[in-house]
Amino acid sequence: MNPSIIKQLIEAGMAGAQVEVMGDDGVHFEARVISEAFAGKLPLARHRMVYATLGDKMGGEIHALALKTLTPEEAAKAGVA
């Protein structure tokens, strides 16, 4: 598994999301996902939304995925938009 495939899967499952995925060992990854769909949702719900886009790859091809999930407004305040 490589970061670009994970990025494509998340983008396909979350229309309009801005996604950045890093990882160089093929099983451990970090992702920053910025989406308006996260508005009003707690972190756990946001993470579940992202995991849902990856299906059975989580726990299989993807051993670990550290997530940073933000709305566009939160990203702008954090200076990452």
Predicted feature descriptions by range:
Residues 1-26:
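N-terminal first-folded block
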Residues 51-81:
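C-terminal structural segments of small proteins and small subunits
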Residues 10, 49-51:
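Sequence-pattern detector for short linear motifs
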Residues 1-5, 26-43, 51-56, 63-64:
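Conserved N-terminal glycine/acidic-rich loop preference
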Residues 22, 32-34, 68-70:
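Solvent-exposed beta-strand sheet faces enriched in polar/charged residues
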